[in-house]
Amino acid sequence: MKVFEAKTLLTEAEKRAQEYKDLKSKMVKLKKAFKAVADLDDSEFSGKGANNIKSFYEDQAGIADQWIDLIEMKISFLTSIPGFLEDANLSDAYIEETFLAHELANAYTKSKSIMSEQKKAMKDILNDINDILPLDLFSTETFKNELSSAEKKRKEAIEKMDEVDQNLTSEYGLSEANEQMIQADYQALMNATAKGKSASPIHYNAKAYRDSEIHKMTEDVKKQSTDYISFKDQQAEQRRIAKEQEELANRPWYEKSWDAVCNFTGEVSGYYDYKRAADGVDPVTGEKLTAGQRVAAGAMAAAGYIPIVGWAGKLAKGGKAVYSTSKALYRADKALDVYKTPKTFHALQNSSKGLYGLASANGFSEAITGRDMFGNKVSKERQEQSLSGAMAMLVPFGARGINKKLNAKSSSRVSEASTNTSKKPKVPKTYKRPTYFRKGVRDKVWENAKDSTGSVKDPLTKQVMKKDEPWDMGHKPGYEFRKHQQSAMERNISRKQFLDEHNNPDHYQPELPSSNRSHKGEDMTDDYFGD
């Protein structure tokens, strides 16, 4: 028999999370101690035995790092429990499964039976006096509706309790699997210290340990931990944004002006409109926005467009925000399931056309006059992008094809067209941009970018990236293509030499598409740091 007691669960989860935080602090100190021994200078500690001991503690530090990742997984899991309960409306619930599954179920059946018997008895009585005083039999419709509503709540309570139990159990199971892998890796480390019947760090065989099958799997464990923690961070952010939307959903859109735009969210590329409205700075270009652009961003967000999932009023049914433990991956549409709350979008759905009208109007204003709806001057780049943006906002409301009729181009093509109008020296075919990189170049760039923890971070946003998700081959500052092209022409090198330099992994770094295409991290000088 299951007994669900939210208060006890939340209290214990908070307590255990704090214990793990304390443990993490101690493990970090232990890792530093291991590293201190491993990094001892030869003048302080040398010899074959010394090298074995230093290698031993170097690998011990690696295992300590795995424990730290596991602890962070545990903390992420425990601190997400309040969100799980809130999603299921069980934050203050106390439920005994046997009461719901048996007592209430029996009461439902018995109540229906009693009412049926009473109605039959009353019908017989009324039939007996019908010739004297005709009377209508009372309606049981209200009773049936109330009983049906109670039965629905009973079933939903059981489903929610089972769902929360399943979600928490499956996610916790993921960390248990990682824990077993770390323990096995530690055992492999200990086995590598054995020599005959004795075991000591002085006998440590680093090659045997590092070549062991179990140790080779630690990268997968590391990735699984990183992916899970990243998922929980995103989940927490989405829940926070959903709360803000629910608070604003009951207000008419025209009241959501300057003080409210900071709380809207949503855009095809993520929640960039939320960031634009809240911070007043475009997260892609770094450009400071005018008041009109901030209001338009708020309107765009408030209309309810949710990344990946789609329009608020047309969200796909089914699925849960459950992390898949089988492949250590999660589906984006499931992770965004938290947005599927009727309260959040009820008002927004009804007002979305007006909101997009507001955002679109600001776009036309910028494109035609070079100023936003409040009269503030906008940059030339923003003006070029505004027309296509305004057109795109009208598409959901019957304006499909309008871009073609009015010859409106996409923002990238508008920018490209305006750039092409200016006269530029013709680039010889020898130095034209290649359409692809040689085999293995992208993999090498990714490997070169890994930090000491094995993570790859976007240089602009510092966000941890995933190799199996979209990323760009961004030029390192000083190695931009325009500089390389100019340098190649000045040196009059061959096409082969040009391609060899173009495919040099040392000239590139992994970047998020939004960071790479913003050109924000480029070196604006004409100096080329290559060959």
Curated annotation (Swiss-Prot):
Keywords: Coiled coil, Hydrolase, Nuclease, Secreted, Toxin. InterPro entries: Bact_secretion_toxin (IPR051768), LXG_dom (IPR006829), PT-TG_dom (IPR027797), YqcG_C (IPR026835). Toxic component of one of 6 LXG toxin-immunity modules in this strain. They promote kin selection, mediate competition in biofilms, and drive spatial segregation of different strains, indicating that LXG toxins may help avoid warfare between strains in biofilms. Mediates intercellular competition during biofilm formation; disruption of the operon disadvantages the bacteria, but overexpression of the cognate immunity protein restores growth in competition with wild-type. Residues 408-430, 469-531 are annotated as: Disordered. Residues 2-39, 139-171 form a coiled coil. Disruption phenotype: Deletion of the yqcF-yqcG operon has no visible growth phenotype, however it is out-competed by wild-type cells. It is found in: Secreted. The gene is yqcG. Residues 1-235 form the LXG domain. GO terms for cellular component: extracellular region. It comes from Bacillus subtilis (strain 168). PROSITE patterns: LXG. Its main location: secreted. One of its GO terms (molecular function) is nuclease activity. Pfam families: GH-E (PF14410), LXG (PF04740), PT-TG (PF14449). This is Toxin YqcG. Residues 469-483, 497-509 have a biased composition (Basic and acidic residues). In the N-terminal section; belongs to the LXG family. Residues 408-422 have a biased composition (Polar residues). The keyword DNA-binding does not apply. It comes from the Bacteria. Probably interacts with cognate immunity protein YqcF but not with non-cognate immunity proteins. The interaction inhibits the toxic activity of YqcF.
